[in-house]
Amino acid sequence: MIDLMPKKNTFLLKKKYKEDSNNSVINNLFDFFGKEFCFHQITLTGFPIIWIDKTLLIEVGKFLYHLSQPYIMLYDLHGVDERIRLHREDLPKADFSVFYHLISIERNSDIMIKVPLLENDLILPTFTGLFPNANWYERETWDMFGIIFNNHPNLTRIIMPSTWKGHPLRKNYSARATEYEPFFLNEQKEDLEMEGLKFKPELWGMKRKNDNVEFMFLNLGPNHPSAHGAFRIVLQLDGENIVDCVPDIGYHHRGAEKMAERQSWHSYIPYTDRIEYLGGCVNELPYVLAVEKLANISVPEKAEVIRVMMSELFRINSHLLYISTFIQDVGCMTPVFFAFTDRQKIYDLIEAITGARMHPAWFRIGGVANDLPQGWNILLKEFLDWMPKRLKYYINTALKNSILIHRSKGIAEYNKKEALQWGVTGAGLRATGLNFDVRKWRPYSGYQNYTFEVPVGSGISDCYSRVMIKVEEIYQSLFILKQCLCNMPSGPFKSEDSLTTPPSKECVLQNIETMITHFLQVSWGPVIPENESFQMIEATKGINSYYLISDGGTMSYRTRIRTPSFPHLQQIPSVIRGSLISDLIVYLGSIDFVMSDVDR
């Protein structure tokens, strides 16, 4: 039997180093800029949040970027409408705020910089001079809140159509369609929308021709099979060579962050499944963990192991689809049909446990929905016996094929520095040789108790290394699943906290208050204490996270969902310029994205 006890003090040492690093950077900021210009907000996020005046923004960014152990990655950037927030005690006066979430790999720590803004002065300097991936994040922040970023290279809508009116994440923008005029689409309006989709190269700094050649502009998507969803890339071509390109996203947008403001903390769980629709329970995990931090709910050990088991099953399921469709994009059809056979076995196991297949909505605040059914271990063991042999088949018949290797090795390359500049996470980052897996470096749900390795590349991330990293990750997930099978604890599958679990019959018979509390929490939803929390996880396609702000109500005041696919698509032009169209198809297949994850 595999030992599930934590390895000797490794997790505690990392945690202590992280706390010391946080204290150090706070003191450095206060010493350099002065305490009167920096306000330290205490939250449940697990990292320091520092409010600064907007005049200091670029200087603070440069200061953090050039530390001896620098904050090298802009992980996230977005906004908050602060106007109707009730619990803002001691926070700087603000109608809106913009937050900048930075990560230091060397410190294994984060910091969030917040800038308060008044409604009559919603202007900030662009961060693109320091972090190129700020481009799309600033466009989305303007799109959703109307906050202007001076000197931005192209501050246009990115999620909503160019013809859209208003900024949807403002609090005075209704979340319900019934509060608007009925939608209609006549011929005139259709022409207007089609005109808005017309690509104008000059708006993107592109020339239609140079001295020797007239460029062709080609729409790849939004209905192209190799675009992997409703995704459009406009290519500037010189023959078959890509001179430049512009990714166009937003076709799959469903307003997931806005929906969170009108759903109870509990009833929002089904929406999390659909953020990245192949990840299933993996998507539920960062949300419920973040809510549990806010509510100070401890999860039983059995529930933690079940969560890990389900997450790894969905990870394998997603990776199998990715590997097989990548092989298909390169030109081999057979493996994709074998992969669907293997994925069917996983879905049968998931359905036996949860009652659903792709979108179980099965994790709960405080645990999981049900205990494991009888026979779950037999199904899991059968799958664990089956899968390693099948993986060898994929490797020997397709991934060692000389044509596939020739078509993918050395294609769409980038190094560690470039990956960090663009906010790349997951297999794409680890293929550059950087060993950064959240399950190891920032363990959650008990991952520190499992033995597994983190596959890394040799220094350059290309199409072939990215797919081979995912193959190795399947082997590691199988090893984690074996540990779950051999060491499943007994005990409850859900916390007994009254915020999430109905009272026992004994309590009901003795205390009428328990019934009143239960009635209110079922009808209105649990009331979560005011605070802020954050949780990142190693999802199937990279790092996924939820940043939650509670105002002490039954619904979230602000839910920010940071997905890995969004920055991965933003990186495309910097990687593919100078390559062939055929190389772009292979590159898209190697990224591992779905558009629901990008557009939310």
From Swiss-Prot:
Annotated segments matching region NADH dehydrogenase I subunit D: 214-600
Main enzyme class: translocase
Renumbered residue ranges of the record's region NADH dehydrogenase I subunit C: 1-190
Catalysed reactions, as listed in the record: a quinone + NADH + 5 H(+)(in) = a quinol + NAD(+) + 4 H(+)(out)
Keywords: Cell inner membrane, Cell membrane, Membrane, Multifunctional enzyme, NAD, Quinone, Translocase, Transport, Ubiquinone
GO cellular component: NADH dehydrogenase complex; plasma membrane
EC number: 7.1.1.-
Keyword NAD: yes
Key word RNA-binding present: no
GO terms, molecular function: NAD binding; NADH dehydrogenase (ubiquinone) activity; NADH:ubiquinone reductase (non-electrogenic) activity; quinone binding
Coiled coil regions, renumbered to chain: none
Subcellular location, record wording: Cell inner membrane
Membrane-protein topology: Peripheral membrane protein
A Pfam family the protein falls into: Complex1_49kDa
Gene3D superfamilies listed in its UniProt record: Cytochrome-c3 Hydrogenase, chain B (1.10.645.10), NADH:ubiquinone oxidoreductase, 30kDa subunit (3.30.460.80)
Protein role: NDH-1 shuttles electrons from NADH, via FMN and iron-sulfur (Fe-S) centers, to quinones in the respiratory chain. The immediate electron acceptor for the enzyme in this species is believed to be ubiquinone. Couples the redox reaction to proton translocation (for every two electrons transferred, four hydrogen ions are translocated across the cytoplasmic membrane), and thus conserves the redox energy in a proton gradient.
Subunit structure as annotated in this protein's UniProt entry: NDH-1 is composed of 13 different subunits. Subunits NuoB, CD, E, F, and G constitute the peripheral sector of the complex.
Family in the record: In the N-terminal section; belongs to the complex I 30 kDa subunit family. In the C-terminal section; belongs to the complex I 49 kDa subunit family.
Name of the featured protein: NADH-quinone oxidoreductase subunit C/D
Gene: nuoC
